Amino acid sequence: MSPEKAFTQQQKDAMVAAIKQAEKDTSGEIRVHIENRSKIDVLDRAADVFAHLNLHKTAQRNGVLIYVALLDHKSAILGDAGINAKVPADFWDSIMKNMVAKFKEGKITEGICEAVITAGEQLKVYFPYQTDDVNELPDEISFQ
């Protein structure tokens, strides 16, 4: 089964709504990428996806990727240089722990949505919305 078919339309809509809500008050960009398997180390794969989705090309280097390999039960959260320079060293790990705890309860969508919202809260602190802000990347989930 393709990873996209693992989610109902309502679940996909909830994740997109979380992205839109998280980005509403920040210039930061958040993307969610879901696939069945990572054929290489999960962090290496997440870095490849990060580059493929152009998260490294935001003006303030404040892109965030939430990566999930469903069948491998692996995930990663990567921030670009701009946001990584601002958040505490263990910030992404704490979001990951909360997300994985939800996954273990079978609440994949809820875990992803909460991770997106939490990342957005930090982006808002360090990269608040500017009146001339443009949405640099699409507010959507990518599947592979």
PLM features: residue spans?
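A structural boundary signal for the start of the first folded domain, especially the loop/turn
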Residues: M1-G63, V68-Q144
